[in-house]
């Protein structure tokens, strides 16, 4: 609507008006994501304002676990530490006690033997070997339904260890 007020002309076409509202909403949505500490993780894999493929193609049970992970709802130290105002660098993984317990660490790096066993069972070697943030982003942006199912099983079983 800012465009409407700046240019001071009436918009009679409903589709133009709807597109303007959508564009403004998406701008605000992106701004909120990038300016929030919680949004830092979300912005790794969520680039567009659209429904995610996994929501349409996975079973409800699998969707729940993927969504919990993507919305930082697994009670990882990075999140629980935020609740108690613990400095970010002190939110250490409870399983390996080596580094910050964030989503990247949980999914690809944690050296806890049980997590490693699950990772070896459910995640392809490509993601496990020499993990990096590009692979992490790729894993969370995949379109492969079978891999997403295996990822959801890994998340569910690994979360039970927390």
Predicted segment positions?
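Family-specific functional microsites
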Residues: 3-6, 11, 24, 32-162
């Amino acid at each position: 609507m800012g465009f409407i007020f700046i240019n001071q002309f009436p918009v009679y076409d409903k589709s133009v008006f709807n597109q303007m509202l959508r564009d403004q909403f998406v701008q605000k949505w992106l701004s909120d994501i990038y300016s929030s500490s919680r949004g830092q993780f979300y912005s790794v894999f969520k680039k567009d304002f659209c429904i995610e493929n996994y929501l349409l193609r996975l079973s409800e049970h699998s969707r729940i676990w993927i969504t919990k992970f993507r919305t930082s709802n697994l009670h990882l130290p990075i999140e629980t530490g935020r609740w108690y105002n613990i400095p970010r660098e002190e939110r250490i993984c409870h399983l390996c006690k080596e580094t910050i317990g964030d989503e990247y660490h949980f999914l690809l790096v944690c050296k806890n033997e049980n997590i490693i066993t699950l990772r070896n069972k459910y995640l392809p070697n490509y993601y496990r070997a020499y993990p990096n943030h590009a692979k992490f982003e790729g894993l969370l942006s995949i379109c492969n339904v079978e891999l997403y199912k295996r990822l959801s099983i890994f998340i569910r079983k690994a979360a039970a260890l927390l």
